[in-house]
Amino acid sequence: MTAAPQPLQPPVQPTAHASRGPARPPLDGRKAMIECRGVQKYYGDYHALRGIDLTIREGEFFSLLGPSGCGKTTLLRTIAGFEGIDGGVVLVDGRDMANVPANVRPTNMVFQSYAIFPHLTVAENVGFGLRRDPRSRAEKAAAVEDALGMVGLKGYGGRAAHALSGGQRQRVALARALILKPKVLLLDEPLSALDRKMREQMQVELIKLQRQVGITFVLVTHDQEEALVMSDRIAVMFEGEIAQLDGPEALYARPASRRVADFIGVMNFMPARIMGGGADHVTVAVPGFGTVDIPAANVSRADRGDAGPSIGFRPEAATLLPAGAEAPGRVTEGVIDEVVYYGDMTYYDVIMDGSDAYDGVPHEVRISMRNVFGREVPDVGTRVRVSWSPGSLVLFR
C-alpha cells in the first residue's frame, strides 16, 4: 500500500507576507488586547453580528476580511464604541467596554474617508485631538511634528490640507490617530480610495509603522491581497459570522471551507466522489485526475448548497508542459481554452480530458506560469499536459 501524500504546504508565490520582517514573538505569548465574547448586533430584524467570539493580541496586526455587508465594519465600530451591541461583551485591555463612550476608550479610528478638515493646515488637523491637552503650546507642536515624522510628513505642518494628495491625506489621518497614543488603532478600509500603485506602497508603510509603534492594528478590508500581505492573522467573515480565523499562509493553503477557498485568491474546483480512506487520508475519484489519496490535513468542509464533494487546488500548484513531455508527479492532459497575460505571469485556462464524466460539464482549470523572456507561449487550442501532486489538492466534503 502506498504511503499517503504529504499535506499541502504553504505556497511560495501568492503574497508578499514575508515583508512583515523578522520572526515575531508567538501570538500566544502576548496578552489579549481585544476580546469579543458572543457579540450580537441587530438592525431591526437584520442580524448583523451573530455571536462573534474573537481574541486579538497585543501588538498584533489583525484583519477583518469579507465581502460587502458581511459585518466587518459593524464589528469594528462596536469595538470603537460607535455602535452599541445587543448581546455579548467587548473588552479592551481587559476592561469591559459596556457604557464606555468612544472618546474615552483606549482606541482610535482611521476612517475610509480620512475625515480631514480641508480648511485647516496639516498641523492643525494632526493636533486637533490635543485641544484640551494640558501640555504647553510648544510641547503640543513638538508632538505634532513627531507624529508627522512618524508617517513621513516631517515639514508638512504648514501646508493646506485641501492641497494634499490622497496618499498624503491618508498619512495625516494616521498621524492624527496616533498622536493620542491609543492602545489600539482601528482602520476602516483606509486604502480603498488610492490607486493600485499607491495602495501597494501604503501597505508596506503601514506594516513598518505598526512595527515601529508596536500597538495593535485592526484593519477592515474587502481586498484579499491586502489582508494577506499585511496581517499576522485574518478573520474571514460571511453574513455576520467568522468563517475562518488563521494566519495568511494557513488561510491560503488550508481554507476551512469551499466558500473561504473561493474568496481567497484563485482556486480550481473539480467534482469528486469519495471512495474510502484511512486515518491519514481520504481516497477520492476525480474526473480527469483518476483516483487520488488526499492527506487528512487537507480535508475541509463543504458549504450549505454545495452539489457534493469537490477537490480544489491553486493555479501555481500545477505545471503546464507540452504534450508528450515527461513530467514528475501525476499528469493530466487537456486543451488550452484561454490565455490571460499579466506581465510577469500568464494564466492558462485548460479544459481537462474526461472532466465531464460526472456531470456532463467539461471542467476548466487555471494554471499560472511565471513568464520567462524568450520562452514560447502556447496558443489557445494547444494540447498540453498538466503535472500536479496529490499533496497540493484540498478536499471539500
Residue ranges and their predicted role:
Residues T55, L91, R385-S387:
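ABC ATPase nucleotide-binding domain
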Residues F61, A102-D262:
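ABC ATPase nucleotide-binding domains
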